[in-house]
Amino acid sequence: MSFDLRTRLDARRAAHLYRQRPLLQSPQGPQVIVDGQPLLAFCNNDYMGLANHPEVIAAWQAGAERWGVGGGASHLVIGHSAPHHELEEALAELTGRPRALLFSNGYMANLGAVTALVGQGDTVLEDRLNHASLLDAGLLSGARFSRYLHNDVSSLEARLEKSVGDTLVVTDGVFSMDGDIADLPALARSAKAKGAWLMVDDAHGFGPLGANGAGIVEHFGLSMDDVPVLVGTLGKSFGTSGAFVAGSEELIETLIQFARPYIYTTSQPPALACATLKSLQLLRTEHWRREHLTRLIQQFRRGAEQIGLQLMDSFTPIQPIMIGDAGRALHLSQLLRERGLLVTAIRPPTVPAGSARLRVTLSAAHSEADVQLLLNTLEQCYPLLDASHSSEPVHA
């Protein structure tokens, strides 16, 4: 019996859910070349505008000269280089925690943390809109797995009453497709009241949130006692690649011993850690980046309201324009692209059925003129949305 892959692919295409990879032919930034076309992009996660920063590039080059271009082995063999260790110490300082542990990417950090902490006989409770990596981690952990209603503390508490064994409450800090933030103070209170631990994946909060860019935990003034497990990624606001988990001495040592995605993989290039150390320095010292980004977010929301666009309740750089139908979302994305703007249409299964959207993301590298151009073009294109649309998707 053969695998009928063609039928699956045809069904996805017919539902306007077929995904294709745009080919980036320039460095990351607001001005890009995609599939040969110059475009103004509003769809990357380089929130602080550091992915193509000359000082970060120079740090990578110097790191490669000093340390070479490969990690060479896993961290537990001979792949844990001095730059890796220095970056872990810097990330621990940023988060105000005793230790931090580097992972190769955010998916591996989430999978490693959850599966190392809970298993059969334990409980994982997750927000239903968590990132796919967190949901996969919960399912793969072998623990009793349940999802509570989005940002709904009462729904969480009802599930906490039925939890068994060690219980891990897991949430995004900033929800990647909606842009809203978790009610961490309430989640922390509920978890602590039942003796559960709270784990936060703050992939999209580091950089934009907090007085020093230390994310949602800093934003709310919470402690390690409130949020014992804190995850961050380095491929967004830090402008490089990788991820980390920050927490207590015991937590990090537990992950080193039991987190299989950490143990059984080659370390990242040491030069990458050198680059990230530089971007971390810029993130902590160049506060104008957060201030400028905040102004751009406010500008976009004011303008979108005047146009009559339906936005989500978000004060973060993630500003989704709700469309509903996947075909209509693709059509609006195509209309913008024809006018030189790149904004990705997000469709199921990434978001729930009937909630397709254009996911606008803003960066400190954008200018006020860039945002105004986006608003002007949206005002032109939105009335055209109900015209016949192409069945060929152009983005994810």
From Swiss-Prot:
Family: Belongs to the class-II pyridoxal-phosphate-dependent aminotransferase family. BioF subfamily.
Pfam families listed in its UniProt record: Aminotran_1_2
One GO MF term: 8-amino-7-oxononanoate synthase activity
Keywords: Biotin biosynthesis, Pyridoxal phosphate, Transferase
EC number(s) stated in the UniProt entry for this protein: 2.3.1.47
Sequence positions that bind pyridoxal 5'-phosphate: 106-107, 176, 204, 233
Name of the featured protein: 8-amino-7-oxononanoate synthase
Pathway in which this enzyme or protein is active: Cofactor biosynthesis; biotin biosynthesis
NCBIfam families, alphabetized: bioF (TIGR00858)
Binding site for substrate: 19, 131, 350
Known catalytic reactions: 6-carboxyhexanoyl-[ACP] + L-alanine + H(+) = (8S)-8-amino-7-oxononanoate + holo-[ACP] + CO2
EC primary class: transferase
GO BP terms: biotin biosynthetic process
The protein's assembly and partners: Homodimer.
N6-(pyridoxal phosphate)lysine: residues bearing it: 236
Cofactors, names only: pyridoxal 5'-phosphate
Described purpose of this protein according to its UniProt entry: Catalyzes the decarboxylative condensation of pimeloyl-[acyl-carrier protein] and L-alanine to produce 8-amino-7-oxononanoate (AON), [acyl-carrier protein], and carbon dioxide.
